[in-house]
Every structure is written in structure tokens, then in C-alpha cells.
Amino acid sequence: MQLKKLSQKQKLYLLVIGLVVIFVLWMSGKLVKKEELHLEEMPIANEELFIFGTGETIEGLSVQEVYTDRGIYHFEGDMDFTPYLYQSIQAVTEGQEILHINNLLQREVRLENCLITENNSDQMCVFTEGFFIWLPCKNLQVQFQNEIADIYIANGSITKISKKKEFVSGKILSIRPEGIELEKYGIVPVSENFRFYKTYGDYEEKTTYELVVGYEPAKLIVAEGEICAAVQEKPISLEKIRVLLKTTDFAEMIHKEITVKAQGDYEIFYGGHRELLKTGEELQLNPQSDYLTENRVILIPQNDTSRLEITSIQRNYGSPIYAGQIEIMKESGGLMLINEVDLETYLYGVVPSEMPASYELEALKAQAVCARSYAYRQILLNGYAMYGAHVDDSVSYQVYNNLPTDEKVIKAVDETAGKVLKFGDEVAVTYYFSTSCGYTTNETIWENGTRENSYISGKLLNDTKKKLDLTTEEKFREFILNETEMTYDSGESWYRWEITVPLEQITENICSIENIGKIKNIQVTERNEGGVVQNVLLTGEKGTLELKHEHAIRVALNGKGQKIRRVYGKDAEGGNMLPSGFFVVDRVEEQGELKGFCFRGGGFGHGAGMSQNGANHMAEAGKSCEEILALFYEGTILSNI
């Protein structure tokens, strides 16, 4: 058959069709490749898993969860793990999901440093990773109760129990990467699979850093020269606090040298030696001192009236004087200084450093409760565990011993002795600050803040109990520019303030963060409860910059050295941050040219929790400590620790 010749038009048509087909195939290939790439990225694997139980056998697991030696896995459908309990399987997994069980394996598994809570002859209850697991055993004749052991399991039953009997106890001096430092033992290494169990009340598993320094919080189980587990059998009575004392002006943690002068007799303990430091005698230490050959010197008072003056540092009233025990440790770069003191005595030094001692007694009592609640939480948080302290003596925690105490402060602390604020069963978070703008705010002003603590919230500080929405620019501007709004703080000089910051200074501040050129505009784009700034957008000649959270915003927009006009009293000078985040901002122009920005605001401090000046004015109006705390921390109760 003779083929017909194609015309030019037909050839062009076929060419176009061919190109379309090629393109479609190419795209299909691309799509297939994308799919293949996606599948390759999914963590599909064959894993060996030991099955300890499912939601049917372990309380706390859902019906679609299984607990293994590699943690909790999920599964879909009606997959049955009953035939595989207390045995090893090979399974196909995708992340933490079991897709398919391949087969049963003959493998022994070890539960390391687990807590045996109880047992009978054919079952043993183990607490590990927050779960109680009943494991089958055969003719077990020994009774266990809250003991640490390694347990070996294979083929559906316990094959071996290796009980760990050796333990040490003693005051924990510090918790470091290289181990736990114990009084009389030094630093003892911690095993890689260390476990810490609380066995009173509800059983809990904790972390190493929840072992509270300065106490003997738990029995420490030792195996092969390492601490492998800890068991806390009863609550700790938190009667003492360990305070890291900073240098003059609270500038540094590390001291080049330390000089102490005894006001009363002290015993000096160092490297197994003991000496007496008598009244009036001085002890001067530097990193090369013979006293520090084993890195630590401890000075213990011989009676309750003995005090140590630290003459190498200065506070507002001169060289500070401390009750309690003083420890000096050699650290990289110099010496570290810690004061271990009774919690109530510590508050004698905190309350006057945080609130003027001349304030009303009921306000001082409220401050004492807040300071005690804060200190209690910080002891448990163990923030300076690496250095053997709970807090330092600066504004990073609570200012301590910066001003002398007096009889009214002692009375306020004593009349509230042992009292804290609680919300439910937990000690409350008790933020406080100097002066409000008339309205407070919540914890989300800070970068990691949440609304978890509902008692820290925005409220109008007067007796009207009015709720105001100050999150809009219009409403907040109306509120903050009203210098006569009657609240508990309205008689304070910082109740309303105004500062103008030149354009050059604002530009320099912002360009030190990010060079966006000369600033052209500042706009508050979001306000939190009470009207405090949450987000600010800065526009420069070279770009824009968004600032978030009140502290960062106050620092960036500071008018250091500029005059601050206050509603009452003398003008003040701007510092390293604006007085508060409760402000509005306006352009300052001359003949149409931008010259700077005017910030008009109210209050002094972050604005969350208790206004100290507001508390004092409430006390002046006849309010009690309980009434003051009920306003600022709504829903909390005053309770014994």
C-alpha cells in the first residue's frame, strides 16, 4: 500500500502533539520522582521491639498505643499484641507507628535502673518512665518494695533480677556535667541511664537537676562507681536557701578575691581541716590560697548571733553582713561565694531591698508572702544547681541584703512566717513590680509566657472592678493620657510620664540591633491586656524591623540621658529602658521634618502581678495583707508551705 504524503500543516500538528506528549511524560516523571523522594524521606524501618504492654495492660496508655523498650508506639486498626507480650518482635515502623509485625524474635531485654514497687510469687510491678508494668515471673520467693534493680526478660517471663543494694547519702553541694558533688564524697559520676524516683504520694520520675542542692533529698544508689538511681522517699522540708552572692554592683558571679570579717566565732572547714575564726578576725582568700587546695572552704557560725561581714564587696549600706553559713569555691576565673541561710532570715534581707521599709505593715506583709512564695519555687527549680545555689542576690531573682533590715520588716516576715500563696495545690507564681499605670497585664508579655497561671491577669486597680479592653490603640490612648484616672497608684510620680527621644538616638538604638537606616516611623501593631505593647513595627530608610515583647521593646526604644517628665515630683533621667511598656508613641516634627519620637506612658516595671506602690496605698486605705494579695492574685489562697 502506498503511503500518503503528509502536508506541512499535518506535520506541524503532529509535532505539536508530540511535544505535548513529551511534556506530559516529563511532568509525570517529575511527579513520580517527587513521590519517590517523599517516600524516601519517610522513616520506614525494620525495628526490633520488646513489647511490655498495651492500653489494655498498662494504665495511662490509649487503646491504640503499645509500650516498648524504645518508648511508646502507635498502631492503627485491630492489630493484636497479646501473643507478643513480654517478648521481642521484628516490626515495620514509620516514625513512632507500627505498621506491621513481621515475626517473633528470641531476644533478652534488660530494664536498667528500674524501680520495683511490689511483687508476689508470679508477678512483679515495675515503675519506669511514668508507667506501672506488671511482669510475669516464676516462683519468686523474695519480697521487693521500692528497690532499684536491673531486670532481664525473655520469652514472656523475668529471667534475672540484679538488685542494686549499695547507696550513699549526703548533702548535695552541686550538680555538674561530670557528676553530683556530695559533702564528704566529692564529685561522684552519674551513669548514662540514671533514674530519679519519687515514691511518696503519687509515684513520679524526675530528672537529675530536680535533686535539690543544699539538701539530702534522696537515697543515691551506686553501682560500679557511678550513681545510677535516686529514690526520694519523703518530702523535703525547705527551710534553707542557698544564695550566690555577686560582686559590687551585682556585676559578676566570679570574685577575684574575697575578704571576710567575723562578727562572732566561726569554724573554718577546708580539705579535711578545721580552724576557728574568732570575733574581729579576717580571712582573705584568692584562687592560690592554701585553704582552697581542694576547691572549697566552708565557714559555719558557732551560734545564732554570729555574722560575717564581706568586706571585699559593697552594697547600698556598705559592706554587707550575712547570717548563716558562707561557702567559697574555686571556679574557672576566680572564686564563687554562696550564703546558705534560713529562708525566713533570707526574707529579712529581701523585703527591705525590694520594698521600702517605711511602707505600711500590711504592704510589707504582702511583699513577704510574695518573696517567700517566689523563693520556695526557686529552691525547687534549682536554677544554679551547677554552682550549688538556688538564686543569686541580684534583680535576676530577688535583691537580697542590699539595704539593712529593720523592726517593721522583721515583724512583717514573722507575722507571715511559713505563709505562701497557693493556687490549687501548687505554690503560686508571684511576680511583682514597682508602679502600675492603673491596669496590670498577664504573663504573655514575656517571650516564653503562657496563660497557664490565670491569676496573673489584667485588671483595673481600684474598687470598681470594671473590666476595660485596652488592647486597641484608641481605647488605650484615651486611658493613658488621662492623668486623673483614679486607681491605687494614681498618687505616684511614675503613674504618668513623658519622654522625647531624638531621632538620632532612636536610629542608633535600632541600628545596633539591625541596620534599617534612619528611622522614619514607629508603629505599635499589637497591645496585650492592659494596653502594654506586645509588637512594634519600625520603618527605616533601608527596611523594617519588628520588635516583640515589652522588655525588648523598652530596651530598644530607651531614651538614656533624656529628661522624663513625671506627673508628680521632679523630672527623672532616662535609663537603659523605658519606664514601662504601657505607652503611646507620637512623631515630633519641626516644620514638617521628623526630629524624634515622644513616648507618653504610665507605670514603672513590667506590669504583671502586684504593684508594690499600689499595695502600699491599699494598706494606707485600710486593706489587709490578705485583701491586697486577693486583688493582685485573684483565685489564690494564703496557706502554709
Where are these regions (language model features)?
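Conserved, single-site charged/polar hotspot
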Residues: 2-641
